[in-house]
Regions:
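Intrinsically disordered, low-complexity Pro/Gly/Ser/Thr-rich segments with frequent PxxP/GP/PP motifs
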Residues: 123-161
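Secreted, periplasmic, or luminal enzymes acting at the cell surface/secretory milieu
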Residues: 1-110, 141, 170, 174-178
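Non-catalytic terminal accessory/regulatory regions of metabolic enzymes
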Residues: 211-217
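Beta-strand elements of well-folded, non-transmembrane domains
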Residues: 86, 103-105, 119-121, 153-155, ...
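Short acidic, flexible loop segments centered on an aromatic residue
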Residues: 106-123, 129-131
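Low-complexity, Pro/Ser/Thr- and charge-rich linker/hinge segments at domain boundaries
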Residues: 194-210
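Intrinsic-disorder/low-complexity, polar/charged segments enriched in Ser/Thr/Lys/Arg/Asp/Glu/Gln
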Residues: 94-96, 144-148, 185
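Terminal connector regions
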Residues: 153-198
Length: 217
């Protein structure tokens, strides 16, 4: 039961390997919904948009108590030899991401390797990074294993309301590998090419930065 499991963890007979599915803030006032909850009567507005959870805290560069994906262990893990099978790929193709993970402690343990993607194309309204893949790997003391992920255009995409479909802008993306959203051990760069480009509309709200980043202006 729960008591036996807690006893095994406290005495070191078992090694924890769970990860937090949410961010623990330092203060309730730091949460994105603080000013909107409990709302007016039965009406509550959710204004976060895509900036939910760790995306909100990352975008505002806010310190947190425990980050998304964080977890405890009686052992330690080292990441090394992170690499891509290609520096560039196109829509319809894929690229593999590989990294070696080693248990450098004295106990068997399980590490959850998390892969985040950061859009560096200049697309507005995207979080600093987004979790796209993860895998749990079991390692004996001193054991090392290679972890592999396959990335496609879908892993770089966001839903574009103007296009009415999922879309990945051509350009550079960062691939971040780590223990949690705030504990990144390796960063790689990959370029994505696609024949379809999002329509660039210039109006009174267009910024100088947006104009300078687009080669069509």
């Amino acid at each position: 039961g729960v008591g036996a499991a807690a006893d095994a963890l406290l005495w070191g007979d078992a090694n924890p390997s769970g990860r937090l599915p949410e961010t623990w803030p330092l203060r309730l006032e730091d949460t994105p919904c603080y000013l909107d909850f409990p709302g007016d009567g039965r009406h509550v507005e959710y204004r976060e948009g895509v900036y939910v959870g760790y995306r909100w805290y990352d975008a505002r560069k806010m310190p947190v108590l425990w980050p998304f994906g964080h977890g405890l262990s009686y052992t330690g893990f080292v990441y090394r030899n992170a690499q891509l099978t290609a520096d560039e790929f196109a829509e319809g193709d894929s690229v593999r991401v590989r990294v070696s993970v080693k248990n450098v402690g004295m106990m068997p343990g399980k590490e959850v390797v998390q892969l985040y993607v950061a859009d560096c194309t200049g697309t507005t309204g995207r979080p600093p990074k987004e979790l796209r893949k993860f895998v749990k790997v079991k390692l004996e003391p001193g054991e090392e294993k290679q972890v592999e992920f396959t990335l496609t255009a879908q892993d770089l995409s966001y839903y574009d309301e103007t296009l009415g479909s999922w879309y990945a802008a051509p350009g550079e993306y960062k691939i971040l590998l780590g223990h949690s959203s705030r504990d990144i051990h390796a960063t790689l760069s990959v370029r994505f090419s696609a024949p379809r480009r999002r329509p660039f509309v210039i109006d009174e709200n267009t910024t100088i930065g947006e104009l300078s980043k687009d080669d069509r202006t």
